[in-house]
Amino acid sequence: MLEYKSFFFLLAVQLISISASSQETYKGPSQCGDMEVWDYSTGMCSPRAMSEMPMSMVMLHGNAFFVQTYEERPRGRDAFSIPNMLMFDVGKSVKNHYFNVDVMATVEKWTYPKDGYPELLQIGEKNEDDEPYIDAQHPHSSPIMGLTLSDTISLGDDRDYLKIFFAPRGQSTDGPVAFMHRVTGMVNPDAPLGHHIGQDVGHITSTVLGVSWAVGRATIEASAFNGTEPHPTAVDLPLGPLNSYAGRFIYRTSDRSYLMGSAAYVKEPEPDEPTLDHIWRYSASFYNEHVINEGWRFYNTFIYGLVNFYDNTGALNSFSEEFLFTSNWHNIWGRIEYLQRTSSELDILSATPFEPHWVTALTVGYTYNLLKWKDGKFGLGASLTKDFLPTDFRDSYGGDPLSGKIFLQLEGMKMWNFSSARSEMPKMNEHSH
């Protein structure tokens, strides 16, 4: 009964948010200036080349949490971790081309405990001892999560463009906007539990060659890439054959909301599982923002993900609803997750290994901005997560476990414009990240 209640509660929250997005006060990609376009892969405004206004841009964005976690036993543990990311972006326009180098970096390999960042029900990847991360989030590839070289070609006077990109490591064109780039995800130190079920898993991919074509309200993206996932604890940047493919379609339903859908064929995703030839990943997502009044904004993200042939299972599904109420000093946020797990993934020996079971995780959090300055902020936050488990999992977890986190957050963004038309160049959208 709880499973159905969780699903309908999640659906109700989404319907409320959709109705809110129809109001005129809502803002989104329309916040970009005349010399900017909306980059859906990073959820932010990006410079657009104009032949009569040559420009050079540098952008630096960082986000770090200093987190103390407390979890109920027997599966829980207490630990200190520092989830973090640093994005460095440099670009230059030449006529109607904008050439760009984007670097995504982290040092999580050195700021996470050996067993990973504590997060009950989280799965995915293996540590340096070749042991799977269970009830823990793996560190992201350190120090380089992504290195992308791109050429964005402006098509006419409108914001239509063609983007061609190559990444030794970067984002393939499947999945939603990655959690670390979503406004609703950037306030939460936890990665979504659906991270490896069609949601964010494509945001760190090896050897990506892709194209993005934006025309009017629609954007069509395609990429070829190497399907084998980079090892999260290896300090490397390997290249591989282009043996996997993905496509994504994005439609801007209004100036302040958009839909995204994707599909991907992924060849040999797990090198440790030679019998797994390929998997299919699918996702659908919706993003919007609503201005409540002059002081408060509401952001919302809804995500559905599906993976076929994962962990010897025909299909695994995940639903996620993220929200953020934010003002100048206060941030109220949360995540509602409803997804399938197998006992094999969670190392539960008392249940059928590969049978999917629905689990629910409800998270609510609050962050107070202690300090704010022009290019950054420093906040104090806390969150509580309550997990609701099926009967087959409850004995292993001692019931429906509760976990809590207390953290400090340091976030900042700085942009430098070296354009000769500097006075006419709009600033980067402050709500992009």
Regions inferred by a protein language model and the residue ranges of each:
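Residues that define the transmembrane beta-barrel architecture of outer-membrane proteins
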Residues: 56, 78-86, 141-147, 203-207, ...
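Transmembrane beta-barrel strands of outer-membrane/channel proteins
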Residues: 60, 64-68, 101-107, 164-168, ...
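Sequence/structural signature of outer-membrane beta-barrel proteins
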Residues: 67-74, 108-110, 169-173, 192, ...
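Residues on the lipid-exposed face of transmembrane beta-strands in outer-membrane beta-barrel proteins
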Residues: 86-92, 147-153, 209-215, 222, ...
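Repeated loop/turn-to-beta-strand initiation elements of outer-membrane beta-barrel proteins
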Residues: 95-100, 157-162, 217-221, 255-261, ...
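Outer-membrane beta-barrel translocator/channel fold
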Residues: 110-117, 125-141, 263-272, 277, ...
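Surface-exposed coil loops of outer-membrane beta-barrel proteins
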Residues: 114-250
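Outer-membrane beta-barrel "beta-signal"
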Residues: 364, 398-433
